[in-house]
Amino acid sequence: MNLRPYQEQAADFLFERDRAMILAPVGAGKTAITLVAMRDALHHGIVNRFLVLAPKRVAESVWAAEAAKWSPTLKIAVAVGTPKQRLAAFNSVADVVVTNYDNLQSLPHLNFDGIVFDELTRLKNPSGARFKALHKLIDCKVRWGLTGSFTSNGLEDVFGQCKIIDQTLLGRSKGAFQQQYFVLVNKDFGEWAPRPGSLEKVMAVIKPATFVLTGQSSETQLHTVEVRCDMDMANYKTMKEEFVLEGIAAVNAAVVVGKLQQLASGFIYDTKVVAADTPGRFTTTQTPVWYSSHKFDRLDELLQENQHANTIIAYTYKEELAELKRRYPKAQTLDDAGVIERWNAGKVELLLVHPKSAGHGLNLQYGGSKIVFLSLPWSLELYEQTIGRLHRSGQTQDVWCYVMLTNKTVDERIWAALHDKRTVSDIAMGELC
């Protein structure tokens, strides 16, 4: 298989630099690009052996499969599984060893001079255990980072990602980085806000080490459709009033949003604390109480309107998953053995996914082109990554994303918040182009 012209440019960019990052929309082919660059670097003796760090599911199922397509001469070993299996992979003669980030703190003595960080945002926190373990163990001359969500959650994320690639880009100290580009807005909580123009300045600094693929590289279009539905608002309004009276919003906004989002989907968890058999011990039980089936009824109509075309349905809560399974007994999840292969073969009509498990690197573009968000994740990164399972290199049809929103509920605020966060990402990508 051959790379597209824009992908060849990205592969050349990596090959020509020891320290570099590829920023690309989800599905633009970052893995294929990197495999070709790795192959060339190994062939020319620039690197003797590569280590790839990736999210677990991607390490297990993506890199070896993609290597067979794009760089079949590469010897790939996957260091995932039991300690014995991981050690065997590290001790093999493979050109490339792929492992997951969770294994960082138990890595054996390393003999790699090249490293690839698949989904670089996993290392955005320079004070995190992953970052510290990696910084201590690995000193490779060639460091490449891949991500589709560089600044999804704000400018502060950029520092850690750049530091692990090249400390000369933004310096060694996050404190100095904050002092230069941010203003302290809340000393008690350590909250910082970017100074005017900081985003543009930071992106200009890191531009020489960064290759950006824009959404224009995709051959297919992404269409986003709001699917609106109504519910009886009596219970919803009552709950909002109770939260205000009890002052819960000021203490734990996440609890408020979670409860209201549940109710916008038609149910709520009744949480009770129950005394356990052991004195002084308590357990928490959650029983779903249903008030409305409006979203699921509208989902039925939507699937019928699309003539039951193969569709991914993204959910947030376990009770949503349970109801989906009740309504659609033949629906499958990512936990079902061989489901990815069956989906890509067009043999799965409904695939139920949680955004946290359907993120980085999964190739689902061959089995369908429609995705429904029954409820939305709060994270822009999770939202984009989930859509990117379909809207990626290799997709032959326009992708249709349906976002189900209950009118006059927190659904609308979550949807608006995702758009607000997107502004930061769009500015960053545009500045680097």
Q: Predicted regions span which residues?
A:
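Conserved motor-coupling elements within RecA-like helicase/translocase cores
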Residues: 84-97, 339-350
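Conserved helix-turn-beta segment of the N-terminal RecA-like "Helicase ATP-binding" lobe
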Residues: 58-82, 168
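Conserved helicase ATPase motor motifs in RecA-like P-loop NTPase domains
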Residues: 26-27, 141-155, 163
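Inter-lobe coupling linker of SF2 helicases/translocases
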Residues: 98-104, 109-112, 128-140, 145, ...
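SF2 helicase motor core recognition
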Residues: 104-109, 153-155, 319-323, 339-345, ...
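Conserved Walker A/P-loop ATP-binding site and its immediately adjacent core
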Residues: 33, 46-69, 154-157, 317-318
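Conserved Helicase C-terminal RecA-like lobe
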Residues: 1, 15-19, 25-29, 33-42, ...
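A conserved SF2-helicase RecA2
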Residues: 378-433
